[in-house]
């Protein structure tokens, strides 16, 4: 299973990182870090297509997606096109990501940043805060509900928002147990990488009002976004489609219907 494999490798890598910089030293360094920006405000704008645009070099299923990968150049195009937030992959082995991409983009742009990774430890949340992320991804499928709540509350204590990703009703139960306020519905099954494009239609009616809902994966045109917005989605996480376009700026504008 792909998800299990990635998480196993993440845990091993994390132990090595912790040896060089223990959590107590990492937390002490947070006093000099950026102040997180208001993510919820930008994701729930009613009169716009709110896009979380991904900065992603590779994936386990597709390999290298963008050969000429320049995270800052991509971020500039996204920002010029008016995206609501960036999603920056930081997982190094399967997605060829890096925390340094967050630090770089944070330094030169004003758009909120999601650390997209396979977070299994509070250490990674402290890292996200130190490098300049404004919110983090937690994958409900990867962890039990009690540990999810521990991670969620730690993130909140650092003033980071959390995008809680779900794929089925069991995941949704975990998200509601945690009282997540931003819930992402991933059309892609992270165990098999199969897609279910009807998932938002099935799950959105089960989510209490007042939650911010993000539709994720497999979105390619403006009409899909408009339809999902009518169903109750507030924002859309889009990555691979933009990475494959010659003009990222034009691709975002097309997606937004502008």
From Swiss-Prot:
Its EC number is 4.1.1.48. CDD domains: IGPS. Keywords: Amino-acid biosynthesis, Aromatic amino acid biosynthesis, Decarboxylase, Lyase, Tryptophan biosynthesis. It is an enzyme of class 4 (lyase). It catalyses: 1-(2-carboxyphenylamino)-1-deoxy-D-ribulose 5-phosphate + H(+) = (1S,2R)-1-C-(indol-3-yl)glycerol 3-phosphate + CO2 + H2O. It comes from the Bacteria. One of its GO terms (molecular function) is phosphoribosylanthranilate isomerase activity. Signal peptide: none annotated. One of its GO terms (biological process) is L-tryptophan biosynthetic process. SUPFAM superfamilies: Ribulose-phoshate binding barrel. Coiled coil: none annotated. Belongs to the TrpC family. HAMAP family: IGPS_B (MF_00134_B). PANTHER family: INDOLE-3-GLYCEROL-PHOSPHATE SYNTHASE (PTHR22854:SF2), TRYPTOPHAN BIOSYNTHESIS PROTEIN (PTHR22854). This is Indole-3-glycerol phosphate synthase. It comes from Campylobacter fetus subsp. fetus (strain 82-40). The gene is trpC.
